[in-house]
């Protein structure tokens, strides 16, 4: 039997703005406080480890470390947020963080 090429570590989208951006437009830039161990194809989910809902299969790519919210400006249009200040305020545990490009995978 052929093994799935989906990575083990799911990526969670519990904040509506980036989740809706991803599902409506097929792409979202997301900033996470902790650097992910895995990138590549994985499952996007909503919820937590005990109870979650599968949203889609996605491809996660690391962009780089972000120190200040102003550095998010080039990615704002595809973040789901209106301002970098709003986006920065939603990053769990705040900045610095790690920026990822997440696309729906075919």
How does the language model describe each region?
Residues 2-106:
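Structured alpha/beta reader/binder surfaces that contact nucleic acids or chromatin modification marks
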């Amino acid at each position: 039997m052929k093994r799935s090429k989906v990575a083990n570590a799911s990526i969670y989208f519990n904040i509506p703005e980036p989740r809706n951006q991803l599902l409506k437009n097929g792409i979202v830039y997301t900033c996470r406080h902790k650097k992910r161990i895995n990138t590549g194809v994985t499952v996007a989910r909503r919820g937590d480890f005990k109870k979650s809902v599968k949203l889609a299969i996605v491809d996660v790519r690391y962009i780089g470390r972000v120190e200040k919210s102003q550095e998010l400006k080039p990615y704002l249009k595809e973040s789901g947020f209106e301002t970098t200040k709003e986006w920065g305020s939603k990053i769990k545990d705040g900045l610095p963080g790690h920026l990822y490009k997440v696309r729906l995978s075919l």
